């Protein structure tokens, strides 16, 4: 891969990377041309509209979740490299205070994750939605107060941008692809260990309605760079 990239760089004027993480990787290959970062675009309106239409209430009713519950939502492929097991392990502590984790999507690792939920006795505060249609994706983000991810395998992570566009702040494991995405305390947080993760959840719980609204607005504004 490195050799092919270097050869390609010799015949082009510029390489385009979707994130700063990939730019650094390419520059580590010692390519001969400049590397510019241009994020893959998304249709912001699709996710903004779901917020305006108040899908939060509708999806929560559909999933049997209280409107007052603190909900963490993950949207994406259920695959081992997404490190979803970490979210389940952390949910053992987060769930003690009534926090609900909603895992949206399907994938080859789903049976293992369901088995993990049984082993950890988390059935009361972890919900699997299974596969949903593309039209429903933006609606399911709205079920959450915070979008969570433990993945460190992303090149850009379009779900981060989608969540932000819907006004959902992020709580994600620290990763290079998030350097230009998350501003701690503004549109979400990055975490390094379980204690950080749980602390941020408690911080959100302790916020007033106005403070939460400001972070949600900043999340939506920050998505415009995509």
Residue positions per predicted region:
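A conserved mid-protein helix/loop that constitutes part of the nucleotide-sugar donor-binding site
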Residues: 70-93, 108-114
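Membrane-proximal helix-turn-helix segments that form the acceptor-binding/catalytic region
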Residues: 1-15
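Short alpha-helical donor nucleotide-sugar binding micro-motif in glycosyltransferases
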Residues: 131-132, 139-144
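Short hydrophobic beta-strand element within catalytic cores of glycosyltransferases
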Residues: 169-172, 182
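Carbohydrate-associated surface elements
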Residues: 21, 41
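Aromatic "clamp/platform" in nucleotide-sugar-dependent glycosyltransferases that forms part
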Residues: 152
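A charged, aromatic-enriched C-terminal amphipathic alpha-helix characteristic of glycosyltransferases
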Residues: 195, 210-226
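Conserved acidic donor-binding segment of nucleotide-sugar-dependent glycosyltransferases
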Residues: 184-185, 189-195, 203-209
């Amino acid at each position: 891969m490195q050799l092919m990239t270097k050869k390609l760089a010799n015949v082009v004027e510029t390489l385009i990377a979707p994130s700063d993480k990939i730019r650094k990787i390419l520059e580590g290959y010692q390519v001969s041309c400049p590397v510019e970062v241009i994020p893959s675009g998304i249709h912001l309106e699709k996710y903004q509209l779901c917020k305006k239409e108040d899908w939060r209430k509708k999806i929560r009713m559909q999933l049997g979740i209280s409107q007052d519950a603190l909900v963490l939502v993950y949207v994406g492929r259920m695959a081992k490299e997404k490190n979803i097991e970490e979210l389940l392990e952390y949910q053992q502590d987060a769930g003690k205070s009534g926090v609900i984790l909603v895992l949206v999507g399907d994938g080859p690792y789903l049976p293992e994750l369901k088995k993990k939920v049984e082993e950890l006795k988390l059935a009361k505060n972890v919900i699997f939605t299974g596969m949903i249609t593309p039209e429903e994706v933006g609606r399911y983000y709205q079920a959450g107060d915070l979008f969570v991810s433990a993945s460190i395998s992303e090149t850009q992570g379009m779900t981060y941008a989608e969540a932000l566009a819907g006004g959902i702040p992020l709580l994600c494991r620290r990763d290079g692809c998030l350097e230009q995405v998350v501003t701690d305390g503004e549109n979400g947080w990055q975490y390094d260990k379980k204690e950080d993760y749980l602390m941020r959840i408690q911080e959100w719980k302790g916020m007033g309605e106005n403070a939460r609204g400001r972070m949600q607005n900043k999340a939506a504004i920050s998505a415009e760079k995509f």
